[in-house]
Amino acid sequence: MVRANKRNEALRIESALLNKIAMLGTEKTAEAVGVDKSQISRWKRDWIPKFSMLLAVLEWGVVDDDMARLARQVASILTNKKRPAATERSEQIQMEF
């Protein structure tokens, strides 16, 4: 059970890391790290799953505030929530036909 929980946590961490790389872009990530972009592609395949498991075993969670904010924005768009009017109700224009 503990192993399954760690594996699930590792998958969550791996997903968060891959999403962050995707949001930033492979080229910008590689530039920030100081490696070629092909190196980042290899890391995604070989190293990130291993590091994710290590982070899960060490209980080193990845805080993903950006992804949470993005998820809220997407949910808002999908539910078509209208923004509240910036005016008082009496100041709004009414058209009658």
From Swiss-Prot:
KW Transcription (keyword) present: yes
Statement: the UniProt record of this protein carries the keyword Cell membrane: no
Swiss-Prot/TrEMBL GO biological process terms: regulation of DNA-templated transcription
Function noted in UniProt: This protein and protein CIII form a complex that is involved in the initiation of lysogeny. The complex binds at either of the cy regulatory sites preceding the CI repressor protein and integrase coding regions and induces transcription of these genes.
Keywords: Activator, DNA-binding, Early protein, Transcription, Transcription regulation
Gene name of the encoded protein: CII
Single GO term (MF): DNA binding
Name of the featured protein: Regulatory protein CII
InterPro entries cross-referenced by the UniProt entry: Lambda_DNA-bd_dom_sf, Transcrpt_activ_CII
Domain of life: Viruses
Protein's organism: Enterobacteria phage 434
Record-stated family: Belongs to the lambda phage CII protein family.
Gene3D superfamilies, alphabetized: lambda repressor-like DNA-binding domains
Residues of the DNA-binding region: 26-45
